[in-house]
């Protein structure tokens, strides 16, 4: 995606999106690695939230007119000469403000308090003691109680601004939570948004519901209705092309757009030959026969595999597949003719602006692996109906639209497909073996009732052969690696702790049913240090 087609995450766009009628909370990002979790926690309460970098916070605040503001954590120190700060307009507008970690420190300093470099740095789990009641703690924490939280800070507040009181303390933070009830300003040194703070979501709920007084009217049903109207307004009588992969994002986007404009939408499904077992047929049946969406199915497997012959480097595989996909998609789109818009399954994390402390915001936008660059090449405008949603919200929207659970709840699948689950050179033989082994593995997981407990599970065909004995004969066949992880966002992951009986029975079934495999291993690597995919 080129600069001219980069979507903006600025809150100033809110009046044009499907959220203008709803209460909103503005999240000012100071560079924390977990700022997105704040937005997700707020949205779990049915309140729409947007993230903006601190450099654009004042303009966003004035344009968005939020009902409350949250100041995120960040890596900087308020003691630095060029330390980022919140716009003072936020503190004079009469709206509730919640500061988290760095957000607490900048709030305290900007309002007249004192922050000092900590003599006792706190990173990781810590115990916090409640020394006074406040609205944030209502029904969650009691005075005198001690509770687990997650800390990550060096500086600390040592003198309160006028109007504030300390309501909790920790060993490294004598002033760990502060409250100004009259102005509805609250701040905490720990991170309530992470799962390592067990009661964190409840504290954020109290800020949203009890402090800000928001009722939560932002639902997937409301989003669906507003998105349909927005698509109709944007597209008018124009035609839309959507690159369909069969994944959750493109599937939900296609169904939502079709609901809005019907047969003005045409989907193009490119089968590059590296899909899972029966995946192509499943996608075609669902969209062409069940939803009656105009669909062009292109079997380009021979073209892709021919170009990939001899390619072993994983990055070279990705680039080759991406280049070929664009070529094939563009050729099919031109055959359709007359299309004005290109639909993408862009999600909110793809358009959030990252924060730079070295000269203004740097925008990190991940274009869809399939259609990046096509809007400009084909002179089309973008339709991105999911650009306000997180992944879990897309799944919820899919259920609202009636998409079968087998699609809505399916595990993430990489754009290059099985190519990066087959280290080394790709051949038809290897892909066939991998498809069958993967199908058996997933079937066993589903039969055990474990599929929904796992973030992602898949088989890998290792580029080695080992000696085995089957019957009375010596074998020399491939090794299959099994991978399954738990995660909340894919950024970090732990391997799933299957019991030995499950692994044993799954291994036996793969070896018995998949010709060309005589050994199965299980990957017990977490992320980090490993990645979820092998390539």
UniProtKB/Swiss-Prot annotation:
UniProt cross-references to CDD domains, sorted A to Z: GATase1_GMP_Synthase, GMP_synthase_C
The kind of enzyme this is, by top-level EC class, is: ligase
Q: Which InterPro entries match?
A: Class_I_gatase-like, GATASE, GMP_synth_C, GMP_synth_GATase, GMP_synthase, GMPS_ATP_PPase_dom, NAD/GMP_synthase, Rossmann-like_a/b/a_fold
Q: What does this protein do?
A: Catalyzes the synthesis of GMP from XMP.
Share what the entry says about its subunit structure, partners included. Answer: Homodimer.
**GO molecular-function terms, A-Z:** ATP binding; GMP synthase activity
Residues binding ATP: 245-251
Sequence ranges assigned to domain Glutamine amidotransferase type-1 in this UniProt record: 24-217
Keywords, alphabetical: ATP-binding, Glutamine amidotransferase, GMP biosynthesis, Ligase, Nucleotide-binding, Purine biosynthesis
Q: Which domain of life is it from?
A: Bacteria
Q: Please name the gene that encodes this protein.
A: guaA
Q: Where is the active site?
A: 101, 191, 193
Q: Name one GO cellular component term.
A: cytosol
Name its pathway: Purine metabolism; GMP biosynthesis; GMP from XMP (L-Gln route): step 1/1
N-terminal signal peptide: none
Name of the protein this chain belongs to = GMP synthase [glutamine-hydrolyzing]
Lineage of origin: Bacteria, Pseudomonadati, Pseudomonadota, Alphaproteobacteria, Hyphomicrobiales
Q: Which organism is the protein's source? A: Nitrobacter winogradskyi (strain ATCC 25391 / DSM 10237 / CIP 104748 / NCIMB 11846 / Nb-255)
């Amino acid at each position: 995606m080129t600069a001219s087609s980069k979507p903006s995450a600025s809150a100033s766009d809110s009046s044009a999106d499907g959220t203008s009628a709803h209460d909103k909370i503005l999240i000012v990002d100071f560079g924390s690695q977990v700022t997105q979790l704040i937005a997700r926690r707020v949205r779990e309460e049915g309140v729409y939230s947007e993230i903006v970098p601190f450099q654009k916070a004042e303009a966003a605040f004035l344009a968005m007119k939020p009902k409350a503001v949250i100041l995120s954590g960040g890596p900087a120190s308020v003691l630095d000469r060029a330390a980022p700060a919140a716009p003072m307009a936020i503190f004079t507008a009469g709206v509730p403000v919640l500061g988290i970690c760095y957000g607490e420190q900048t709030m305290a300093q900007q309002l007249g308090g004192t922050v000092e470099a900590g003599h006792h740095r706190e990173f990781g789990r810590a115990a916090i003691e409640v020394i006074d009641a406040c609205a944030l703690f209502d029904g969650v924490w009691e005075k005198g109680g001690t509770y687990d939280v997650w800390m990550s800070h060096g500086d600390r507040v040592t003198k309160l601004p006028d109007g504030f009181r300390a309501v909790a303390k920790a060993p490294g933070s004598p002033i760990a939570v502060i409250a100004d009830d009259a102005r509805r300003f609250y701040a905490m040194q720990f991170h309530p948004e992470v799962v390592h703070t067990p009661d964190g979501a409840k504290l954020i709920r109290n800020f949203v519901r009890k402090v800000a007084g928001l009722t939560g009217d932002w639902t997937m049903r409301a989003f669906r209705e507003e998105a349909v109207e927005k698509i109709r307004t944007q597209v008018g009588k124009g035609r839309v092309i959507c690159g369909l992969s069969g994944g959750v994002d493109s599937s939900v986007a296609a169904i939502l757009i079709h609901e809005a404009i019907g047969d003005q939408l045409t989907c193009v499904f490119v089968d590059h030959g590296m899909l899972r077992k029966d995946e192509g047929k499943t996608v075609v049946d669902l969209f062409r026969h069940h939803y009656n969406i105009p669909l062009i199915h292109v079997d380009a497997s021979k073209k892709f595999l021919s170009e990939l012959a001899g390619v072993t480097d994983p990055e070279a595989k990705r680039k080759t597949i991406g280049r070929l996909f664009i070529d094939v998609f563009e050729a099919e789109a031109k055959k359709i003719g007359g299309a004005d818009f290109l639909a993408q399954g862009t999600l909110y994390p793809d358009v959030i602006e990252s924060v730079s402390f070295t000269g203004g915001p740097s925008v990190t936008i991940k274009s869809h692996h399939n259609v990046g660059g096509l809007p400009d090449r084909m002179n089309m405008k973008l339709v991105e109906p999911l650009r306000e949603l997180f992944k879990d919200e897309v799944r919820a929207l899919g259920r609202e639209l009636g998409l079968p659970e087998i699609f809505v709840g399916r595990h993430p699948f990489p754009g290059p497909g099985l190519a990066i689950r087959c280290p080394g050179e790709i051949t038809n033989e290897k892909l066939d073996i991998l498809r069958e082994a993967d199908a058996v593995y997933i079937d066993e997981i589903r039969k055990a009732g474990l599929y929904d407990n796992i973030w992602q599970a898949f088989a890998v065909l290792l580029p080695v052969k080992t000696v085995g004995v089957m019957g009375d004969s010596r074998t020399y066949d491939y090794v299959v690696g099994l991978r399954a992880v738990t995660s909340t966002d894919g950024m970090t992951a732990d391997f799933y702790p299957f019991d030995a009986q499950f692994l044993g029975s799954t291994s036996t079934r793969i070896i018995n049913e998949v010709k060309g495999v005589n050994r199965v291993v299980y990957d017990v690597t977490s992320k980090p240090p490993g990645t979820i995919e092998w390539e």
